[in-house]
Amino acid sequence: MPSRRRTLLKVIILGDSGVGKTSLMNQYVNKKFSNQYKATIGADFLTKEVQFEDRLFTLQIWDTAGQERFQSLGVAFYRGADCCVLVYDVNSMKSFENLNNWREEFLIQASPSDPENFPFVLIGNKVDVDDGNSRVVSEKKAKAWCASKGNIPYFETSAKVGTNVEEAFQCIAKDALKSGEEEELYLPDTIDVGTSNQQRSTGCEC
């Protein structure tokens, strides 16, 4: 059977280990959550067909390891990305403080043609933990960070409960489309599958 021609949009998810990158991806693609996911080794990806404005395209979502020893894999995985999703745990100040490092790492490794306008989306995950009583990063602080980076969209999610995950990825898909360089590829009818972690989201200014 001949392959179908689709528009492929590549999305990279970055953030510290344990913030819920895998769970977010799996909740969005497979509508599933598990506490049993192992740490991602290197990188993995899932794909999902999405329809937007009467167009069908394939969203290829890359889940990368948060451990520093795997960051050297970045060039191969980051190149060609149409959108970068930065994820932190609202219950971990360190994961929030490391966002600048992840953003800079991506810009260096991916070398986008227009770094000033490259689309990023920020997700504050695990808002469900301890009913929010363990939270250490306020929504105000996160939005201030987004404002300092050119008013990038911000969502607060729970991959476990599924809160705002769909909304966040709808925004991510729109930003990926708007980023311009859509890559037309011939893809087989089979779809790769990957892994998962935790999250949730709020408002998008797309």
From Swiss-Prot:
Motif, Effector region: chain positions: 37-45
Sites of S-geranylgeranyl cysteine lipidation: C204, C206
Cellular component, GO, one term: plasma membrane
GO molecular function: GTP binding; GTPase activity
Regulation (activators, inhibitors): Regulated by guanine nucleotide exchange factors (GEFs) which promote the exchange of bound GDP for free GTP. Regulated by the MON1-CCZ1 complex which serves as a link between Rab5 and Rab7 protein families in PVCs and mediates PVC maturation.
Highest taxon of source: Eukaryota
Pfam families: Ras
InterPro entries the record matches: P-loop_NTPase, Small_GTP-bd, Small_GTPase
Record: residues binding GTP: 15-23, 63-67, 125-128, 158-159
Keywords from the UniProt entry: Endosome, GTP-binding, Lipoprotein, Membrane, Methylation, Nucleotide-binding, Prenylation, Protein transport, Transport, Vacuole
Membrane disposition: Lipid-anchor
Localisation: Endosome membrane; Vacuole membrane; Prevacuolar compartment membrane
Subunit structure as annotated in this protein's UniProt entry: Interacts with VPS35A.
Family: Belongs to the small GTPase superfamily. Rab family.
PANTHER family: RAB FAMILY (PTHR47981), RAS-RELATED PROTEIN RABG3F (PTHR47981:SF4)
Its biological purpose: Essential for trafficking from prevacuolar compartments to vacuoles. Involved in the trafficking of newly synthesized protein to vacuoles. Essential for plant growth. Participates in the recruitment of the core retromer components to the endosomal membrane by interacting with VPS35A.
Protein name as it appears in the record: Ras-related protein RABG3f
